[in-house]
Amino acid sequence: MKLDGYTRLAAVVANPIKHSISPFIHNRAFEATATNGAYVAWEIEASDLVETVANIRRYQMFGINLSMPYKEQVIPYLDKLSDEARLIGAVNTVVNENGNLIGYNTDGKGFFKCLPSFTISGKKMTLLGAGGAAKSILAQAILDGVSQISVFVRSVSMEKTRPYLDKLQEQTGFKVDLCALEYVSELQARIAESDLLVNATSVGMDGQSSPVPENIVLPETLLVADIIYQPFETPFLKWARSQGNPAVNGLGMLLYQAAEAFQLWTGKEMPTEEIWQSLTEKYQ
C-alpha cells in the first residue's frame, strides 16, 4: 500500500469497533484498484462524534462508515440524506462531495446484491426481526418493488415495532404486515407463500439456537438468508439446507454493503470476487 501526501483517508466509526473486518475489506480494495487511500477503525466516545464528522471535511477524507451506536446520532451533522437513509432513519456511509456530507445506508442494497440470481421486485418476503439490519432490508425491499412483506417479532416487541412500520407506510404507501413470532401457524402460512425468508435477528450467533421452530416446512423454491456470518453456518441455515433450500449467510451482505460504499467514495467497482475469496478463507 502506498502512503504519501496525497493519500485520502476513510474510516469506520463506532464503539466498540476494534474487531471490525471493514479495514481488511477496504484496504484490499484500495490496493486492488490502485486507489491512493487508507482505511482505519476509529473507536470514539459519543462526545467526539461532532468533531469526527468535522474531520471528514477538515482532512478531505473520502468519508466514513458508521456502526452502532452512531448510525442515527450522526444524522443532524450531515448536509443531506439519500432516499433509503431517510426511510430507514439511519446512516452507515457518509460521502464527502466537495465538502458536502451526504448520508447513505448501503446495508439493504448490500443485502439484496449478495443473493444469488434473485431480485425482490414483485416477490413476497418474510422477515424475522425489526432491528437496524431489518429496517434497512425492509426499506430497500420497498424501494425495489417487493409485493408483500411479513415481519415477525416476539409479541413483547410488537408495540415498539409498529410506529416504524406506520412511518414507512406514511412515507411510501406500502403496508407491512406485523405478526408475533409465537404464532407458529401464522408463521408457517406466511413462509409457505414467500419467495424469501430472512433472519435479521441475532438468534443463532451462539451456534445453538434458531429463530424458528424446526417443524416449519419450507416451500421448495424459497431462498433463505441469515444476516449472521459467525458462525459461518448457523443452525437456521443448516436447517434450511437440510430441507433442500438454497441458503445464504451474512458475509455477502457485509462485503456488498462495503462495495456500495467504496463505489460512492471512489467511483470504482470493488473487486468483490477476489475479496470474497479472502473473506471465506478467514471465516469458514
Swiss-Prot record:
Catalysed reaction equations from the record: shikimate + NADP(+) = 3-dehydroshikimate + NADPH + H(+)
Signal peptide coordinates: none
Recorded metabolic or biological pathway in which this protein acts: Metabolic intermediate biosynthesis; chorismate biosynthesis; chorismate from D-erythrose 4-phosphate and phosphoenolpyruvate: step 4/7
Gene: aroE
Lineage summary: Bacteria, Bacillati, Bacillota, Bacilli, Lactobacillales
Active site (record annotation): 71 (proton acceptor)
Enzyme Commission number: 1.1.1.25
This protein's name: Shikimate dehydrogenase (NADP(+))
GO process terms (BP): amino acid biosynthetic process; aromatic amino acid family biosynthetic process; chorismate biosynthetic process; shikimate metabolic process
Pfam families: SDH_C, Shikimate_dh_N
GO molecular function terms attached to this record: NADP binding; shikimate 3-dehydrogenase (NADP+) activity
Subunit structure: Homodimer.
Family of the protein in this entry: Belongs to the shikimate dehydrogenase family.
